[in-house]
Amino acid sequence: EQERVSGLRFKAGIFSNLTHDHLDYHKTFAEYLRCKKLFFDNLPSDAFAITNIDDRNGLVMVQNTKAKVVTYSCRSMADHTCRIVEQSFEGMLLRIDGRESWSCLIGQHNAYNLLALYTTAVSLGADPEEVLVAMSTLRPAPGRLENMKGPKDISVIIDYAHTPDALENVLKTLREIAPDRELICLFGCGGDRDRTKRPEMGQIAQKLADRIIVTADNSRTEKTADIMADIKAGMDLNGRSRSLFIQDREEAIRTAVMIAGPGA
């Protein structure tokens, strides 16, 4: 719609998922979907439209494309498939199209990302074995499920998660890897952005974390207290009783370290 890629000719387009984001601009989810779909509608016939059919909009995105459709999935039959064999904080073992591959990345969402990468490379003519070898050398991006060594045998995981879907993916991943450890979630929401996702993120945090610390996260022109109140609105009494609301981010981080015991 903004024609940011107007005039460019793409060899491939990848649809991974469509989640709650950018609604401050698009206003409705349907409009957000329509704008995303335009990209695939305009792909040339000699391109590849690569889509995640595990997302409910995966097939909708490519229903009018002229490009060759290639599907991928971690849950069902598709042109290319993947599943997590095992995972820890150090990485995960994947089985992609029947071949095993180790990755330093963790989480189901990263399994999807790696499968999308693999599907695209193979569709464009790369050798599958060479792609898997190259994928095994990839390191996590800073601030994306970044594993920091904390004090007192505490695991500290930093992630940019700024949407409900991203926060849920991160917390679920940590729960799966360490189901018996206490999970403390420290987060905030940016100011002058989509306000409707704030209570949803509060609800997700109370559902998946043992303790929650809500703090500032680039409030821009908004009052931090107002942003925190929006997050709090998504929590019930139980969630609020397990939460601390600390505006100063440095103080919030110090508090998280202080209340975290060994094994957290």
Where does each model-flagged region fall?
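C-terminal structured "cap/appendage" subdomains that terminate the fold
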Residues: 235, 243-263
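Conserved phosphate/oxyanion-binding catalytic-loop motifs
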Residues: 159
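Alpha-helical segments flanking ligand/cofactor-binding loops in enzyme cores
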Residues: 30, 37, 41, 172, ...
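Active-site beta-alpha connecting loops in nucleotide-dependent enzymes
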Residues: 140-143, 165-167, 172-238, 249
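Short amphipathic alpha-helical segments
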Residues: 4-7, 27-28, 61-64, 169-171, ...
